[in-house]
Amino acid sequence: MKSQNKYSIRKFSVGASSILIATLLFLSGGQAQAAEKQVNMGNSQEDTVTAQSIGDQQTRENANYQRENGVDEQQHTENLTKNLHNDKTISEENHRKTDDLNKDQLKDDKKSSLNNKNIQRDTTKNNNANPSDVNQGLEQAINDGKQSKVASQQQSKEADNSQDSNANNNLPSQSRIKEAPSLNKLDQTSQREIVNETEIEKVQPQQNNQANDKITNYNFNNEQEVKPQKDEKTLSVSDLKNNQKSPVEPTKDNDKKNGLNLLKSSAVATLPNKGTKELTAKAKDDQTNKVAKQGQYKNQDPIVLVHGFNGFTDDINPSVLAHYWGGNKMNIRQDLEENGYKAYEASISAFGSNYDRAVELYYYIKGGRVDYGAAHAAKYGHERYGKTYEGIYKDWKPGQKVHLVGHSMGGQTIRQLEELLRNGNREEIEYQKKHGGEISPLFKGNHDNMISSITTLGTPHNGTHASDLAGNEALVRQIVFDIGKMFGNKNSRVDFGLAQWGLKQKPNESYIDYVKRVKQSNLWKSKDNGFYDLTREGATDLNRKTSLNPNIVYKTYTGEATHKALNSDRQKADLNMFFPFVITGNLIGKATEKEWRENDGLVSVISSQHPFNQAYTKATDKIQKGIWQVTPTKHDWDHVDFVGQDSSDTVRTREELQDFWHHLADDLVKTEKLTDTKQA
């Protein structure tokens, strides 16, 4: 159903708009002699209908526009004839309403005596002429309009009796179209602008007369060309340059059609004056952003979720694995976003070392091609450069901070990144001095105040017996790396993050050649991987290389899903523990060191709480910087309950998981009051 819009014609304080409206309505009624001189009959017909029919103009005008590009002059003639038959009643009604609206204004403007040529010449000299200047010389145009009205009524009666004959007589010849004067071009454009004025009146009825006068301050320069605005839904009359070219040019018809189409799609023709700027500003204020900008989130600093060992983002994970952040229960990142927290899921190596993963995390946030460092690559025997990241926070620099939240090994990776940002890599600096070449900004150090908080969930800060006793066995490592080799073929979307070790088939490399090359990789005998870094020895080495930053808020969350056995001091896995962790949970539960036995299936409670060599305290409502704030252990929470990956667990509900993450995110927002360097 097409809408029937009602319009009100605005009255200007000086009467210019009312007189102009009346004149144009008279001139366009019934296609009188003045209208016959207009260029392009198809456009003249549309403008006549537009000016005469206020209530039904949308339906007939759209139909004419659809036929405009596919019909010839004969079709325009037939269309005009049909419209003349209906214009009689409509024209008389509109003329009567227009006379009533403008009765008072016409009395004030009877002193105007300039002819139409003077109007065109004056407006050409001064494009910004006041509306009062336009009033001059319109009296003659009004008289001509009245004559046109009579002629229009007579033509309408003749059209009722003999449409075909009179239609041909009323149509201007091709030669007369070419001789159309500039004033009729002005009338044609003005009719379209008058309708657009009524649209603005409908949207903003409270505009004062002064603003209306500015909006209708027209510029009828003969060299104007219609151009659409790029940033505003308004069309400036100054953009109409070069529109009125010589009527003899063969491309004139297309130019006119394009011009009228653009005028139709525009809200109103205006000049870039104060009134226009005010309207544009209001329109921009009313626009709603579909994607919240940084300032519209609760958190000023983005939250970056960093996965642990054997972690993937959905675009590169094996199909057998669940979504890392939330599993089948919920999408944690998306839920945070929907509740007003800006968050991202980092995509880094699943089996790489903490060092390699930290470098990748830096480029994931900052953007660019991963540079593991010339010295590091030479030391461990893998490629120096890795994949290229687009970057989620390209303006990341001192003073522009992020919240880093790491699950499992992700917490260690975050600590390694913070150390590199603040203190750099001495080996890389010395190597660059000796051998020359480029060095990544990450390794130069002096990049403090880029991290607001560090939060760890079930992180083995001091390593885990699971990696000591099982994960670091040669057989286990061989199986995992073989799987990585298999998924490294060029047709696989799965990415284990070991391409720097050669575990990625090249585009023009056969699979046999790829397997032979992988066998020669240094990965099989290197400690530069996640298996070693998760051992108690590897974690201790990281603890020695890292330190607490006095400008960062640290907090740890720890789970426990074991219970004491009946006849011993050993810990047994709970019934609701994630099934794949039952073996490792029982293995850790019988460790020689009793304090290490209580665990979440993969990580001992004592290892998850804080690094042994760094300061810690119990977490309270008082937020502190530069010290590990240890939250109470969450009983009956296994290693993946923090991220909701166990879909079979009925004890830990979706609502509980959602509440945990909302509380965590709200905590991060509170820390910004303490870590915001702009407020300090």
UniProtKB/Swiss-Prot annotation:
Transmembrane segments: none annotated. GO terms for molecular function: metal ion binding; triacylglycerol lipase activity. Belongs to the AB hydrolase superfamily. Lipase family. This is Lipase 1. The keyword Glycosyltransferase does not apply. It catalyses: a triacylglycerol + H2O = a diacylglycerol + a fatty acid + H(+). It comes from Staphylococcus aureus (strain COL). Residues 125-138, 204-223, 235-246 have a biased composition (Polar residues). It holds the Pfam family Lip_C. Residues 148-170 have a biased composition (Low complexity). GO terms for cellular component: extracellular region.
